[in-house]
Regions:
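Helix C-cap/helix->beta junction micro-motif
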Residues: 34, 142, 202-203, 315, ...
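Conserved PLP-anchoring active-site segment centered on the Schiff-base-forming lysine
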Residues: 117-139
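Active-site phosphate-binding strand-loop segment of PLP-dependent enzymes
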Residues: 151-219
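Conserved glycine-rich beta-strand-loop-beta hairpin in the small C-terminal domain of fold type I
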Residues: 284, 300-309, 319-331, 364
Length: 390
């Protein structure tokens, strides 16, 4: 485009920045093109395949001539039923598959659909600090006011409810929570979820729990919807990306009361045209996996976690060994200027990419995150490189 063009982007485009990983991975790609062979421990994208039966189902259904057309906006009945069975079996939550479940093209899109369904320009949204950056960026796109609430190490990375009660809550429509937490690894508990639901009910705030990590290095999967009456004011998003190694398949869902689901569908049905039927039928198969699937998955992650802990220790970082999920979160040494400079020094000095915590908010500034989504062999090589770093 010529520099003197009078065409400008919408104001909302000026409100958000390019996603950190989108920009940083370009830098990593440039380094790789120069032959630096960067080991990436940054992204939480599982490197292992789904169960073989899931892949077989995808291929078998894709070979049929009648499975390539548009599909229902609400997903296949069999998929909604499989999600309901999954919630009943693993979380002890009863859901009406016809009215209380909406499949998503990955749970990330649900952040947009939920925000557009509930938030008007000028409304306020409670967003955790540190937290997933998309909660804030989507709120900005919706022209909402962002109210960040603190998560701090001294409070176990849980909300300070006394502090929350002192915040200006009269215009708050949504509160984003994410337990088991990313990036901190703080676990979900029924006590925590009860407090969150009580807070939402007290202030007429819709609570949204983003719950993709509950099966990773976690013996007790818990759902916010397990709290009595939670469905009245709460929505939970879930995903097969991490729990079933299906990140690129974009298979997610949300669950809530029938009215909330209907409102969200009004938005969603005007944005996309459903999901690929072979992928949905394969997801049904994935959701039927028994406990041995999760046990084998976690056996692999447990071994990688040991190496991640060794890397953190070598870097002089401190960390909580009780963390859940797909990452390890650690506090950088006091002498380091910032998490960004610390991570860049490792990137250029050891050719290992880890995530600086500042991207998750100001409360993440003194922290870094290591992903478990690299082979144990690669992680051991990363450890070796860091040991040799000057």
């Amino acid at each position: 485009m010529e520099k003197n063009s009078n065409i400008c982007p919408a104001n909302r485009v000026r409100q958000v920045k390019e996603y950190y990983f989108s920009k940083k991975l370009k830098e990593v790609a440039q380094l790789n093109a120069k032959g630096m062979d960067i080991i990436s421990l940054g992204i939480g994208g599982p490197d292992r395949p789904p169960h073989q039966s899931v892949i077989d189902t995808l291929c078998d259904v894709a070979r049929r001539h009648d499975t390539h057309g548009y599909q229902p906006y609400v997903g296949l009945p069999s998929l909604r039923g499989a999600y309901a069975d999954w919630y009943r079996r693993w979380y002890g939550v009863e859901l009406n598959p016809d009215k209380e479940i909406q499949p998503l093209i990955g749970s990330k899109e649900g952040i947009l659909h939920i925000t557009l369904a509930f938030v008007n320009p000028g409304d306020a949204v409670l967003v955790p600090n540190p937290g997933y950056p998309t909660y804030s960026s989507v709120s900005k796109l919706a022209e909402a006011e962002i109210l960040t609430y603190n998560l701090k190490e001294e409070n176990g990375w849980y909300p300070d409810f006394n502090e929350l009660e002192r915040m200006p809550l009269d215009r708050v429509k949504l509160m984003w929570v994410n337990y088991p937490n990313m990036p901190t690894g703080a676990p979900a508990t029924m006590e925590l979820f009860q407090k969150i639901v009580d807070f939402g009910r007290r202030h007429n705030i819709v609570i949204v729990n983003d719950n993709p990590y509950s099966f990773i290095l976690n013996d007790n999967p818990v759902s916010l919807l397990s709290v009595s009456g939670a469905k009245d004011i709460a929505i939970e998003m879930n995903s097969l990306s991490k729990s079933h190694n299906m990140a690129g398949w974009r298979m997610g869902m949300l669950a809530s009361n029938a009215q909330f689901v209907e409102w969200i569908l009004k938005v969603k049905s005007n944005i996309d045209s459903g999901q690929f039927r072979p992928a949905m039928e394969a997801a049904v198969k994935a959701l039927s996996c028994d406990g041995s699937w999760y046990a084998e998955l976690n056996k692999v992650y447990a071994e990688r976690r040991k190496v991640a802990e060794a890397i953190m220790t070598q870097l002089g970082c401190t960390f909580d060994k009780s963390q859940k999920g797909l990452f390890l979160w650690g506090r950088i040494p006091e002498g380091e200027e910032s998490s960004e400079k610390f991570a860049d020094r490792i990137l250029y000095g050891a050719r290992v990419f880890i995530t600086p915590g500042f991207i998750f908010g100001s409360n993440g500034e003194r922290y870094v995150r290591i992903s478990l989504c690299a082979t144990e062999e690669k992680m051991l090589e990363a450890l070796s490189r860091i040991k040799e770093m000057k």
